[in-house]
Swiss-Prot record:
Lineage: Bacteria, Bacillati, Cyanobacteriota, Cyanophyceae, Synechococcales
EC number: 2.1.1.-
Residues that bind [4Fe-4S] cluster: 177, 181, 184
Keyword Nucleotide-binding: no
Gene Ontology terms: biological process: methylation
Cofactor binding: number and manner: Binds 1 [4Fe-4S] cluster. The cluster is coordinated with 3 cysteines and an exchangeable S-adenosyl-L-methionine.
CDD domains (UniProt xref): radical_SAM_B12_BD
Domain spans labelled Radical SAM core: 163-394
Annotated PANTHER family: ANAEROBIC MAGNESIUM-PROTOPORPHYRIN IX MONOMETHYL ESTER CYCLASE-RELATED, HYPOTHETICAL METHYLTRANSFERASE
GO molecular function, one term: metal ion binding
UniProt cross-references to PROSITE patterns, sorted A to Z: RADICAL_SAM
Protein's name according to its UniProt entry: Uncharacterized methyltransferase sll1242
């Protein structure tokens, strides 16, 4: 069987990092780990070709070659996924679709023309798909009620990737999260009991990446890397030895809950394994909103103190913030900005709350008749809320745009970055010395020219750079990399302001039109007009 695997386009997002990737001559931040895992699960006598549409388009030769087309993606990739399903059908191909989007909204995928829907987790459903093909079936919906044992998951087919196109590779140690955040779809898709691989299993994946010549960053894509602290510590103890033996070829980052700060041993192990950054779902500094959305793990200790501990341990924080929670008070955007400034978090992803399909939030809003469009929850930073909030949407949208704009003001960003790296714990591992390549030197020269010469940030840029060299030189390379990141954020805040502004104007226009129509067609208005006619 000749299988063509297609990964749909992402729209421009906070994480697309176009301007940063341009600097270093790469096209995409991360590879499609789900699809290359699918390729590892399917029969290895099959032939595979993979096209990441974020890297390049599918060629006619590839369409002609394929016997079956397999597409997977997330909700944010909806539009291009639907287009590729239609394109595959136009080429007369059998189309199978899976992944988070198809699992969450199967009707949309089926309506687009998919033949097979391979839903839930592939370790169980992909073998059932293969059996269906062997029986001669040409369509079907394949689901699984149980969660698979991920210790049986094969090594992803990293060899199918165009490795030079990616800035970082992805590996996964665990699935699931023990918490119960109302808005989160991870616990819906993967459950609340974290399932982990064996340490030796993950090390084999790293061995394979190493054999393929990979020597850059690796992102642990676990939704909560520390969901099972016991097992993750077992992994880190073995990973530390592996990294030492291989002279630390990989720099790691990941996602974790804020209670990471409560476990010094765990943070130390991560830093000793060459983890240097962690994404934290902080969401909001408003404790009432955290409790309402059931993010109780963020209310047990001071969030500011937790972030400070994580920084001092040697892990740069990236933080996720959300605006628009039920019961939220005016000024939430300002409070988020103040918190980011207070805690010196350089990179803060920020979005208006969305009700993602089948989450607890989605079900509650559906019961309350507050969903504006049941199927179109999104996770992009340029999308208005898809439900009726408890305070005016225009207030939330305006606060959001203003806060996003302020967070990525070039002066404020450099200051926040500087304060973070002044106290960032130094790396605890000795990496092999290597000369910078020409691409990296060119990128550095561009950043210095833009931020240290051309723009009015020049004084701050040089003051802060020399300050880091003087007070914390071990983190200087990491610091300069984060300075470069604002090349993307400067552009993206313009996109946020423009697209949210356009959507808000359309929304307010529709609201006004609805009011006019309601007034014109209301029984009171009709009765009044009738009386006028009779009186005349």
């Amino acid at each position: 069987m000749r299988a063509l695997l297609i990964y749909p386009l992402f729209p421009p997002t906070f994480w697309s990092y176009e301007k940063i990737l341009e600097l270093v001559g790469r096209k995409v931040l991360l590879p499609p780990l789900g699809l290359i895992t699918v390729a590892g699960i399917l029969p290895q006598e099959w032939e595979f070709k993979l096209v990441d549409r974020n890297v390049r388009n599918v060629t006619e030769a590839e369409w002609d070659w394929a016997e079956v087309v397999i597409i997977s993606g997330m909700i944010v990739q909806r539009d291009d996924m639907v287009e590729n399903i239609k394109e595959a059908k136009a080429h007369g191909k059998l189309v199978a679709v899976g992944g988070p989007f198809a699992t969450s909204v199967p009707d949309e995928v089926q309506n687009a023309g998919a033949d097979f829907l391979i839903l839930d987790e592939g370790e169980i459903t992909l073998p059932l798909f293969v059996e269906a093909l062997e029986r001669g079936e040409t369509a079907g919906i394949i689901r699984a009620q149980e969660k698979p044992d991920v210790t049986t998951t094969p090594i992803p087919r990293y060899d199918l990737l165009e490795l030079d196109a990616y800035d970082s590779m992805s590996v996964q140690f665990s699935r699931g999260c023990p918490f119960q955040c109302e808005f989160c779809d991870i616990i819906v898709l993967y459950g609340r009991k974290p399932r982990t691989k064996e340490p030796a299993q993950l090390l084999r994946e790293l061995d394979y990446l190493y054999e393929l010549g990979w020597r850059r960053s690796v992102f642990m894509v676990d939704d909560n890397f520390i969901g099972n602290k016991r097992n993750v510590k077992l992994l880190l103890k073995e990973l530390k030895v592996w990294q030492e033996e291989h002279q630390y070829p990989f720099r790691f980052n990941t996602e974790a809950s804020v209670d990471l700060a409560d476990d010094q041993e765990l943070m130390d192990l991560m830093v000793e394994c060459y983890f240097d950054a962690v994404f934290l779902g902080i969401e909001t500094p408003d404790e009432e909103s955290l409790e309402f959305t059931k993010k109780f793990q963020n209310t047990r200790n001071s969030l500011a103190d937790s972030v400070d501990k994580i920084i001092k341990a040697g892990l740069r924080p990236m933080a996720g913030f959300i605006i628009g929670f039920d019961g939220e008070k005016q000024g939430a955007g300002d409070r988020i900005v103040r918190f980011a400034e207070q805690t010196a978090i350089p990179t803060t992803t920020f979005a208006m709350l969305q009700a993602l399909p089948n989450t607890a939030l989605w079900h509650r809003l559906k019961r309350e008749n507050r969903l504006l469009d049941e199927s179109k929850g999104n996770i992009n930073q340029t999308t208005l809320m898809n439900f009726i909030p408890t305070r005016p949407l225009e207030d939330i949208a305006n606060e959001y745009v203003e806060a996003f704009w302020e967070l990525y003001d070039p002066h404020g960003y450099l200051d926040r970055n500087y304060r973070c790296f002044l106290k960032l714990g130094a790396p605890k591992c000795k990496t092999a010395f290597k000369l910078p390549n020409l691409v990296d030197l060119k990128a550095l020269a561009i950043v210095i020219w833009r931020q240290g010469v051309k723009r009015d940030t020049r004084f701050r840029f040089w003051h802060h750079a020399f300050g880091i060299l003087r007070h914390n030189p071990a983190v200087f390379e990491h610091y300069i990399t984060l300075c470069a990141h604002n090349e993307h954020f400067l552009q993206y805040r313009e996109i946020v302001r423009q697209e949210i502004g356009e959507q808000l104007r359309d929304y307010l226009s529709r609201q006004q039109q609805d009011k006019v129509e309601e007034t014109v067609l209301s029984p009171t208005a009709i009765a009044a007009e009738t009386e006028k006619v009779l009186a005349s």
